[in-house]
Amino acid sequence: AFSTCTGLTSITIPNSVTSIGDGAFYNCGLISITIPNSVTSIGDGAFNGCSSLTSITIPNSVTSIGYHAFWWCSSLTSVIIGNSVTSIGDEAFSQCSSLTSITIPNSVTSIGKGTFSGCSSLTSITIPNSVTSIGSNAFSCCGSLTSITLPNGLTSIGDHAFNNCYGLTSITIPNSVTSIGSNAFSNCYGLTSITIPNSVTSIGSNAFSNCYGLTSITIPNSVTSIGDLAFYDCSGLTNVTIGNNVTSIGSNAFNGCNGLTI
């Protein structure tokens, strides 16, 4: 509707509007926008490339945020997501490099693929207990993220979910998680401690590769498989305890762990 209107800096959407369509404001010059309470959905790429947009409030009426909805909104510093949103599309806030914090409401049950990838200024994130899955690349390359609390209902951590989050120093994985995806925490070289609970059965390939800040790791009895290169080049590791039920350890799983004693 207003795609590539680069001179458009502000707009008031009337209360009669119930949905914002796909690509509606793609690559616009918007600095601010007010979304009325009548809107229930924000379409795919609706505000994609609105690089001058600094803040957005998503009202409680909105239930879904589409794929790439705010992709490359590189000036966006503040986002308030309403309490009715149940799904956030893949890469919805990807490359929002100025975004410093965000609170995800209790209505959200899953975080999609690459949802916050490349949000390089993001320092904190609150994930509610309603979230059961974190998709692949969800927080990839969020290098300023120093801490994160994973919710108690979480069952899976996707591939590359936190890779290149080199600002992370510690993380506790809740007892509900059963699988840690490949490259889930790769290149998190600021990570000094990690707790893997007894619920986890598999650790993916490269899951903790290049986490050279880790000094010790305990793999619980619940784990049956450790993927290829899972702890590759964790050169700071001096102690690893492997549970009794591991039946397969992938190739080069501990390669480059030069200080390791088992």
Place the predicted regions along the sequence by residue.
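Structural signature of tandem-repeat unit edges
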Residues: 5-19, 28-41, 51-64, 74-87, ...
